[in-house]
């Protein structure tokens, strides 16, 4: 009996080995038989029924989020792989696996510092991929932990509303319990939302989080860490062609950029480490970090 394998049909645990199955991409794999429902099955992984190898798919993700266009990745594959992939397929991989990894990374508890900077970026997204219907002004709201350089929470939203900002702040509160100070720009919506999200302690008569406002128009300087992160993000997104006219596509791609920034990209200020190595020290990733994150999600 093999107890660690569970039947996908009836969730039964009375499983025995029943031969093998061999495919061109996956090679030889063990097949199992459930004694409860008489179903034969192969344990599925996130790449089930994908027509390309996990190594090729994760290579496409890495090249795309490092700066290559989908057609640039396609040309790269044409030179090194016998079976090429269409540029639209590469974009679908980026969307699909970004959201899949995000379902895992968004629920991680972080060991952050006590200081967070929060800001937003304006983006112009095409209203339609094919029709000429103009552009729509959207917002990318994000936050960074100063100590670990980890992008704690982010959201690509249609409007810079109070609910959208509260959504980002609520995720910060869920992920880390160390926050003592949050710095924002002079947007008036931040003042009430920060106080309401983190609450007030009646005993000490004090808000649980200090809210600092840095207004550049008054000569008070900038939130340099979050602005530096924005420069890195802009370097990648400046070549995007209107996010293909889809709010969902924009959200998925920006999630992929967040994952790349936190878990893949090494930072010189962190002495060659990724932010996740400091913020999530228990998470051990191998050389192919994309593959490890997909398998964990």
What residue ranges belong to the model's regions?
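Short metal-coordination and nucleic-acid-contact micro-motifs, chiefly zinc-binding Cys/His arrays
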Residues: 1-6, 27-30
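Short recognition patches in nucleic-acid-associated and regulatory proteins
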Residues: 11-26
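Short, positively charged, Gly/Tyr-enriched micro-motifs
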Residues: 30-114, 122-130, 148
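Active-site beta-loop-alpha junctions of metal-dependent nucleic acid enzymes
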Residues: 50-52, 96, 154-177
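Helix-centered, glycine/charged polyanion-binding patches within enzymatic domains
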Residues: 186-244
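C-terminal domain-tail junction helix/linker
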Residues: 240-243, 247-297
């Amino acid at each position: 009996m093999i107890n660690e394998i569970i039947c996908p049909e009836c969730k039964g645990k009375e499983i025995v080995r029943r031969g093998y199955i061999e495919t061109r991409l996956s090679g030889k794999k063990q097949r199992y038989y459930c004694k409860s429902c008489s179903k034969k099955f192969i344990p599925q992984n996130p790449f089930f029924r994908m027509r390309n190898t996990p190594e090729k798919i994760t290579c496409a993700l890495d090249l795309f989020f490092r700066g290559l266009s989908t057609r640039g990745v396609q040309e790269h594959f044409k030179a090194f792989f016998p079976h090429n992939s269409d540029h639209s397929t590469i974009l679908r991989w980026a969307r699909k696996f970004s959201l899949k990894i995000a379902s895992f990374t968004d629920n991680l508890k972080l060991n952050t510092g006590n200081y967070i900077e929060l800001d937003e970026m304006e983006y112009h997204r095409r209203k339609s991929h094919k029709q000429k219907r103009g552009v729509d002004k959207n917002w990318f709201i994000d936050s960074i932990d100063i100590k670990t350089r980890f992008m704690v929470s982010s959201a690509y939203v249609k409007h810079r509303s109070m609910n959208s900002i509260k959504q980002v702040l609520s995720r910060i509160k869920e992920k880390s319990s160390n926050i003592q100070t949050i710095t924002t720009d002079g947007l008036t919506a931040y003042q009430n939302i920060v106080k309401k999200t983190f609450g007030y302690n009646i005993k000490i008569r004090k808000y649980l989080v200090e809210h600092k406002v840095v207004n550049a128009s008054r000569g008070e300087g900038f939130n340099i860490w979050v602005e530096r992160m924005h420069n890195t993000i802009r370097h990648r997104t400046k070549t995007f062609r209107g996010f293909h006219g889809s709010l969902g596509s924009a959200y998925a791609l920006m999630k992929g950029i967040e994952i790349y920034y936190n878990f893949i990209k090494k930072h010189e200020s962190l002495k060659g480490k990724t932010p996740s190595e400091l913020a999530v020290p228990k998470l051990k990733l191998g050389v192919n970090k994309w593959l490890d994150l997909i398998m964990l999600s």
